């Protein structure tokens, strides 16, 4: 095998506040850790991600989402490493974020961190939403077992588009 393997784990999981509503998180940081950090700082917007298995890097890479929320709604920028070793910052509006996709799936860059802008919220409200969504997940998924992620795709837009073509 010719190439490089990046292991994004506990050595690449720093998380910190940049200002009152902006969080910086490294790619190896788990989404659960990021969501709990936001909760501790009374910041809302990431509740949808609580319980999604995976890391910040993976969530940015595939524009992770659930329960009407997506990474594209809260990310402002991401840092990555290009094949030539240079570090690059991409603003959210240049990431081509769409349903479960981003520019990183085509450009080969390795995501190293992300910056998220959230809104001020009430701790109890944020926690209640996280608990509610985790309860919904538990009722539908066997969370006690390892997960390879989503195996289903939301086809609502595709079906509507297909239906429109059929009608026209």
Regions found by a protein language model. Give the residues of each.
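Short N-terminal helix-initiation segments at or just after the protein's N-terminus
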Residues: 20-25, 50-60, 95-98, 139
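Phosphate/pyrophosphate- and phosphate-bearing ligand-binding catalytic cores of soluble enzymes
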Residues: 81-168
């Amino acid at each position: 095998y010719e190439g490089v393997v990046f292991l994004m784990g506990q050595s690449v999981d720093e998380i910190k506040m940049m200002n009152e509503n902006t969080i910086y998180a490294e790619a190896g940081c788990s989404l659960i850790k990021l969501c709990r950090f936001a909760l501790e700082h009374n910041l809302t917007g990431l509740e949808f991600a609580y319980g999604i298995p995976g890391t910040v890097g993976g969530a940015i890479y595939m524009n992770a989402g659930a329960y009407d929320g997506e990474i594209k709604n809260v990310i402002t920028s991401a840092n990555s490493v290009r094949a030539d070793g240079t570090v690059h910052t991409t603003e959210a509006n240049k990431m081509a974020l769409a349903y479960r996709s981003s520019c990183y799936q085509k450009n080969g860059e390795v995501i190293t961190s992300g910056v998220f802008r959230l809104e001020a919220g009430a701790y109890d409200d944020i926690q209640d939403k996280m608990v509610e969504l985790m309860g919904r997940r538990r009722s539908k998924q066997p969370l006690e077992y390892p997960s390879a992620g989503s195996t289903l795709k939301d086809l609502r837009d595709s079906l509507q588009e297909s239906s429109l073509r059929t009608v026209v």
